[in-house]
Amino acid sequence: MSTETELQVAVKTSAKKDSRKKGQDRSEATLIKRFKGEGVRYKAKLIGIDEVSAARGDKLCQDSMMKLKGVVAGARSKGEHKQKIFLTISFGGIKIFDEKTGALQHHHAVHEISYIAKDITDHRAFGYVCGKEGNHRFVAIKTAQAAEPVILDLRDLFQLIYELKQREELEKKAQKDKQCEQAVYQTILEEDVEDPVYQYIVFEAGHEPIRDPETEENIYQVPTSQKKEGVYDVPKSQPNSQPLEDFESRFAAATPNRNLSMDFDELLEATKVSAVTQLELFGDMSTPPDITSPPTPATPGDAFLPSSSQTLPGSADVFGSMSFGTAAVPSGYVAMGAVLPSFWGQQPLVQQQIAMGAQPPVAQVIPGAQPIAWGQPGLFPATQQAWPTVAGQFPPAAFMPTQTVMPLAAAMFQGPLTPLATVPGTNDSARSSPQSDKPRQKMGKESFKDFQMVQPPPVPSRKPDQPSLTCTSEAFSSYFNKVGVAQDTDDCDDFDISQLNLTPVTSTTPSTNSPPTPAPRQSSPSKSSASHVSDPTADDIFEEGFESPSKSEEQEAPDGSQASSTSDPFGEPSGEPSGDNISPQDGS
């Protein structure tokens, strides 16, 4: 019976110890609760305190422990015993109290404890190193029971304090950063919010663009506020063919006084036939400058040149009633590149005789495919000054400087005197105007009836292959078959006067090379179909320009009143007749 009772007591005691070991929770919350306040209390005896040289070291602690035990052994031989104490472990550190009096003997904070060591010879003894730099001491303690639980509590305490300190520092740092951000934001808000710098930094994400991109003008365009008459915006895209609406609006902007219903068809036809090339942009080199054409839209080629109407305003009384006088002719003295067929056409010889004695002023260069406003006879008021138009006073060397500056490409009209390949074109304005049929038939049959051509001397540089001029009319081809090929680069007028036989021919039969059908209107701006409609006698004047001087002398008497009224501003003798002064009634 007694044996069973002893066994039951032993089982209960062991169970309590096991449950105490298994049930010990070392979580953070439990440890905080454990070391809060007075902390954990242990009964022990103080072995002694010894000064050491370093803050860490296991050998250092073991040597100090053996030294203190030797001191205690000598005192015990004298009958002295170790001091009984109890120590507490808390967040405040290690505190040692006297068991009898309860007085605080020693207090060492956690940050002062630098090393903890266990005695390798006695499981109930341990020690720790405490103190500040230069004053380190080793405290040796012998516990009532095993020293391992005390050492574990000290380890947990140090680990918990370290983690709490790290977390506190992180929280402080985060709080400090947040406070700094809040302070900066508050400073920005307190400052002038209208400052564009702060707007860009703080409020950039919520703002829309100041200007709508669709309303912004293209950087390659001429600003609308700086637009002038004849200056156009650069289109954003370059289509192959311009729409008719865009063409009509540009033409109306350049020529506000033109009648679009009359001239839109012919200008549209000219635009279709004449392609925009580098050579066409600078016009014809062998054609005299225009003296009556209205100002044309500004282009990169003639933006620095004055308009022809401003240069020579006093010539409308001589050529105002003539159809060829109102046609704008590109200048040949600033032009570059080869002559294209679309700029020749049915050019009368009368215009080649305009420049007398001196080089005329340079007019603007007319681009090839830009719609040009060709002046009507009544658009410009008559003035008091006129050009001398005496045909016999044209100096051959008037245009000699153009030989070295901008030579004419003679290959455009080289080759034997063979009929040029022509492509008949359609003319809506001429088809709709029956008044122009009769003058055109007469021009095709009788324009060259009083001339005979002398075979020009062979030119070595000419090639056997004659280029085909697809943009010329039949009258243009017959014109060159009768008169000759284009002049070489040495001369800037169309023909060499010395090579023409001016002997009149009595035969009135039309040339076999001249086609009987009406010649279609060419794409050259030298003469438009509107000129035929406005003045049917222009073809008669065109015929008179090719007549011999003898015939002109015969007609000088009826036209004496008109010739005498025309003054000669260049001081040239006005006794010789001119093809421009011939009356249209005589030509018919």
From Swiss-Prot:
Residues 1-26, 224-243, 420-444, 451-470, 502-588 are annotated as: Disordered. The keyword Cytoplasm applies. Disruption phenotype: Defects in Dab1 are the cause of scrambler and yotari phenotypes, characterized by an abnormal pattern of cerebral cortical lamination and a reduction in cerebellar size, accompanied by a lack of foliation and neural cell ectopia. Mutant mice are normal until 10 days postpartum (P10) but then become ataxic: they tremble, walk with a wide gait, drag their hind limbs, and frequently flip onto their backs. Mice generally die between P20 and P30. Defects are caused by a widespread misplacement of neurons. Phosphorylated by FYN on Tyr-198 and Tyr-220 upon reelin induction in embryonic neurons. Also found phosphorylated on Tyr-232 upon reelin induction. Also phosphorylated on Ser-524 independently of reelin signaling. The keyword Cytoplasm applies. Residues 503-512, 523-534 have a biased composition (Low complexity). Associates with the SH2 domains of SRC, FYN and ABL. Interacts (phosphorylated on tyrosine residues) with CRK and CRKL (via respective SH2 domain). Interacts with SIAH1, LRP8 and VLDLR. Interacts with LRP1. Interacts with APLP1 (via NPXY motif). Interacts with DAB2IP. Interacts with ZSWIM8. This is Disabled homolog 1. It comes from Mus musculus.
